[in-house]
Amino acid sequence: MKKLYLDIDGVLLTTKNTRAADGAVEFIDLALSNFECYWLTTHCKDGNCNQVLKLLAQYFPNDIIERLKRVKPTKWDTLKTEGIDLRSDFYWLDYFVFEAEKQVLKKNLRLDNLILVDQNNKDDLVLKIKYMINQGLNGVLPWDYHMK
């Protein structure tokens, strides 16, 4: 099963006036049903998901939090790319990445696995997960999701 690495801020939660992002519940259902999901967030860089679940419990109902317990932790220190198995088949969903992280992806021929979320488009999160499920990475994705 393809891996899906997830950030929280800017993906599942909005970055301003924090709340659940538009489409987040549908996104979570689709992601958990179709991918092996991993947290790739500053809230869980030590391999412990407790802080993530506690944070998300402020914005999502208990049944969603129970489902989110299936998302696996990652460990990384400086760059999020340290927490990604770059040899695996994966997507990385985030709203912002550092240039150094893009360079790691480029060096490993994985830049196309990065998908940036645009919270200014209320349908963006659900549209992107549906596209990932239906199309995979068989070519260029139909949106400007990173800078090459």
What function would you assign to each model-found segment?
Residues 1-3, 88-89:
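Hydrophobic/aromatic side chains embedded in well-ordered alpha-helices
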Residues 2-78, 147-148:
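Alpha-helical substrate-recognition element adjacent to the catalytic core
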Residues 50-148:
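C-terminal cap/substrate-recognition subdomain and adjoining C-terminal extension
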